[in-house]
């Protein structure tokens, strides 16, 4: 699109449940395998191709920092590994994931000059993004959240969860 974007504007791609995704910048990604992991690589490449400044937020299926992956969705030799407190635990609580994602967004402000963010959340990434937006709004973050776009986010919960909890 021909729209001029502000210098500090960025898109942050947020992975869904049980995802493992490395942190990437517009200029740096993993050197082997999928550049931004299984669920974020195609979205990242599309956004970069359209001229957006796109970052992928780090996610790990469990606590801890992102580690290189083998097998399905493999990636490795990534440029930077961010600390656990900025890494979404994609199998943990939504609220804690939101806190970690908010910390990551504030880090983007401090380290990369990001002042405005458009979130793109895949699956549970939409819920993690919504939780981060709440944290950013209540902590006087210097980053303006412009939008949240979700892809397959379970806003109404899940049928399987309702069934498992005998709500059907």
How would you name each of these model-derived features?
Residues 98-168:
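Serine-dependent carboxylesterase/thioesterase catalytic core
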Residues 9-116:
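Active-site catalytic motif of lipid deacylating hydrolases and related acyltransferases
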Residues 1-8:
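Short beta-strand-to-loop junctions in surface cap/lid or active-site-entrance loops
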